[in-house]
Each structure stands twice: as structure tokens, then as C-alpha cells.
Amino acid sequence: MLPSNVIKELQELTQTNRKGVDALFEAESELAQKEHDLDLVEAQAFLSAEGTVADRQALGRLEAADARLQRDLAKAKVNRVRTKLKVIESEIMAQATMSKMMQAEMKL
């Protein structure tokens, strides 16, 4: 691999990493909104239900099932973005190591 290729790869990975930070913010914002929506649906269902506290809680959870699914999907998205960022950071470190090895070889 040529030094210019290593530099180009590092630049591309760094740019992708920056985009990933923005994607993580968007995913975390979406997750916060979904958690808020879930809390509202559960609370409204609990307050409108009749019966014992246990019955009302169970009905609240049932009525909030779709909102909970959306929240769980948003969590999965956040985790996916975080994982991708870790992979990119590992690739950056590997490329940086290759760059240093190439520098050492050139000095020989």
C-alpha cells in the first residue's frame, strides 16, 4: 500500500467518523422522543383505566406496546451507530499504525 493511499484512507475514515457523530446525535434525539412518547402513552392509559393498581399498570403496558416497540427500535439504532463508530475508530487506529510502520521502513 502506498503512503498516499494510507493518507487518503485516513481522511475518508475521519470524515465518516464525523458524520457518525452527527448520526449518533440524531439517533439519541430520536430515542429521547420515543421514550417521552412511551411515558405519555403509559401514563395516559394508566390514568384512564379502571380497576386495581396492578390492573391499571397491566392495561397501561398493553396500550403502550406500540410505543415501547418504537422506543426499543430507537435504542437499537443508537446501539448500531455506536458500534459502527467503534469499528471506524478501530480502522483509523489500524491505518495510523500502518502509516507509522511505513514511515519506519522508509527511514531504513
Over which residues does each language-model region extend?
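Short acidic DE-rich linear segments
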Residues: M1, A104-L108
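Short, charge-rich amphipathic alpha-helices with coiled-coil/heptad character
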Residues: M1-G20
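The feature represents the first ordered module of a protein
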Residues: T16, L24-A27
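Extended alpha-helical coiled-coil "stalk/arm" regions
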Residues: A27-R56
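Short, glycine/alanine-rich amphipathic alpha-helical segment
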Residues: E50-K77
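Long amphipathic alpha-helical coiled-coil segments
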Residues: E28-L31, E35, R71-M102
